[in-house]
Amino acid sequence: MRKTVIVAMSGGVDSSVVAYLLKKQGEYNVVGLFMKNWGEQDENGECTATKDFRDVERIAEQLSIPYYTVSFSKEYKERVFSRFLREYANGYTPNPDVLCNREIKFDLLQKKVRELKGDFLATGHYCRGGADGTGLSRGIDPNKDQSYFLCGTPKDALSNVLFPLGGMYKTEVRRIAQEAGLATATKKDSTGICFIGKRPFKSFLEQFVADSPGDIIDFDTQQVVGRHEGAHYYTIGQRRGLNIGGMEKPCYVLSKNMEKNIVYIVRGEDHPLLYRQELLAKELNWFVPLQEPMICSAKVRYRSPDEKCSVYPLEDGTVKVIFDVPVKAVTPGQTVAFYQGDICLGGGVIEVPMIHQL
């Protein structure tokens, strides 16, 4: 008897190709499932989720597979969006994609998969592992690898997950879609955070977190060099949006004092204070047993390079991460993912002092 695989379909080319490949294999009963988390409208006033669902319908009809839709909008706002706002208001820089994977896609969506009597869940993530029992590894396309975004998802939640695109390059996925005549073959990839869309980040955030004007201070001179509209708008290492003129070198956000509502900057992209030798990480998730110390590499942002480091477990359940070479713009609230080669060991949330000591 053939097993059933539920394909998480977003209306994009990646999940369309996943459904196509699984149907073509002939080994599974393939069922599409569209998940609505946010009701954002585009510049024409049309809900983008409605347009995406229309594309899911077209692909499902092309492939002759049944499809369903489920809305997690309420749960998304409670478990992802509200935390996102709370963290930003407190000066942190959270990663909502990591939260969404843990709280929605591989928790609530998995419950729906079981309701539909699915044996497997398949997604369009560019990573490897899951149902093959190996935990989680990078996808082979270095420009598309998404293991970073899944580093906070428990191993058990991935135990029935198929990642058909993990061994493919994006160009190959596009080619397959075009050769198969899939309706989404030329559809642009979605970028950015789903609930922000194409809007500038500041204009989005100010709808939910009130402006709070304060001083921008040069950390080295302790002189006021400008004004800001809210310390929560700025993240460590940020250059754009400071609106400070008359400086020989570009200015970068060094740290923030949320209590006093001060943003500290330094001048020059290689200013030594922008670099940290160590960090603490909390809310940890591991795919492998934690050894002491664990010699590995870490990514402190999605697009940052791998940094060699040693990881030491602490009694309170956090870990101390010591880098071989100081790392630039380590940001409290961001996700850190740990690797040995292509294998993702796990991940956590960065916890470093928000205020530099004088």
Curated annotation (Swiss-Prot):
Subcellular locations according to the entry: Cytoplasm
UniProt keywords, alphabetically: ATP-binding, Cytoplasm, Disulfide bond, Nucleotide-binding, RNA-binding, Transferase, tRNA processing, tRNA-binding
Annotated S-S bridges: 100-194
Reactions accelerated catalytically: S-sulfanyl-L-cysteinyl-[protein] + uridine(34) in tRNA + AH2 + ATP = 2-thiouridine(34) in tRNA + L-cysteinyl-[protein] + A + AMP + diphosphate + H(+)
Active site: 100, 194
EC number(s) stated in the UniProt entry for this protein: 2.8.1.13
Keyword Glycosyltransferase: no
GO molecular function: ATP binding; tRNA binding; tRNA-uridine 2-sulfurtransferase activity
Main location: cytoplasm
UniProt: ATP binding residues: 8-15, 35, 124
Any one annotated GO CC term: cytoplasm
Family: Belongs to the MnmA/TRMU family.
General function of this protein: Catalyzes the 2-thiolation of uridine at the wobble position (U34) of tRNA, leading to the formation of s(2)U34.
Protein name: tRNA-specific 2-thiouridylase MnmA
Upper classification of the organism: Bacteria, Pseudomonadati, Chlamydiota, Chlamydiia, Chlamydiales
Gene: mnmA
